[in-house]
A protein has these predicted regions:
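Conserved PLP-enzyme active-site core in the AAT-like
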Residues: 1-146, 181
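Unusually extended, aromatic-enriched hydrophobic runs near protein termini
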Residues: 2-6, 11-15, 27, 111, ...
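Conserved C-terminal alpha-helix-loop-beta "cap" of PLP-dependent enzymes
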Residues: 166, 170-246
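Homeobox/homeodomain signature
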Residues: 92, 110, 119-121, 149-152, ...
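Structural motif of enzymes handling amino- and sulfur-group chemistry
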Residues: 115, 124, 131-180, 192-193, ...
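Generic secondary-structure boundary/loop-capping signal
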Residues: 98-99, 117, 122, 126-128, ...
């Protein structure tokens, strides 16, 4: 039975330590992932949790939620530890998603010390929860791209979009404006902010470039609806009665 420790905004190492008893099997830390607590906060580091677990002969687990192999802070996002960095901190087991920031198919991934992975493989739930062959094939193809970070940034859509420079975004916006120039639109290119989305990096924004569209007869709401109904739906947003295409 899981035992919650600490409070919503502050958790100390002593909260974990005081909750350990004869029935304790593991210490778990869960990433907030799709929300962020600001202000008067405190959390326990991975190093502290792994040390306390070793001292009490327990397993340390970190559920990273999204999980990532690339440090996105160099592209303007707040620093978040990569899967490798969490493992290097001494955590025994790390869990994360195959999609979201990793950019692969929807799946749950468990990595960590071999002795614990082997025990999980023998659990009767493994067969029930295992992914299908198509998911495995897609995940393998995605992970192979990470052998070369440049390849991953170029060919994995999520990573490619996060890492695009502002200059490249302006180039894309100019191309789109040119293609739409013969239509009955007022077209404006502007700088803006964009969210990563997918339940990752809450309250964080990327520098972005957008194309704003206004039509003399159709409202922004009507334009948005029509673009969603085409064969390949186009996702837009509305701001100040303008239709926004984010690059």
């Amino acid at each position: 039975t899981p035992i919650e420790v600490g409070t919503t905004n502050k958790t100390h190492l002593k909260d974990y330590e005081n909750a350990i008893n004869d029935n304790t099997g593991a210490l778990l830390k869960v990433h907030t992932s799709n929300y962020k607590i600001l202000g008067f906060t405190k959390e326990v580091s991975n190093e502290e949790i792994s040390y306390l677990a070793r001292e009490n002969e327990l397993v340390s687990i970190n559920d990273l939620g999204s999980g990532q192999f690339v440090d996105f802070s160099k592209y303007g996002l707040p620093y978040e530890p990569t899967v490798k960095e969490v493992l290097d901190s001494g955590i025994d087991i790390v869990t994360f998603s195959g999609d979201k920031l990793l950019g692969g198919p929807q799946a749950g991934i468990i990595v960590g010390k071999k002795e614990y992975i082997e025990k999980m493989k023998k659990n009767q739930l493994t067969r029930t929860l295992r992914v299908d062959k198509m998911t495995l094939a897609a995940l393998e193809a995605t992970l192979k791209l990470y052998l070369d970070e440049k390849e991953a940034l170029e060919h994995i859509p999520t990573l490619h979009m996060i890492s695009l420079s502002k200059e490249r975004l302006f180039e894309k916006a100019d191309v789109l404006k040119t293609r739409l120039s013969d239509l009955d639109f007022k077209i404006i290119i502007a700088e803006d902010k964009a969210e990563v989305g997918g339940g990752s990096y809450p309250a964080s924004y990327l520098e972005s470039v957008v194309v704003k569209l206004e039509h003399p007869r159709l409202s922004a709401t009507e334009l948005e609806r029509r673009l969603l109904e085409v064969e390949i739906p186009i996702i837009t947003r509305i701001k100040d009665n303008e239709l926004i295409l984010d690059m």
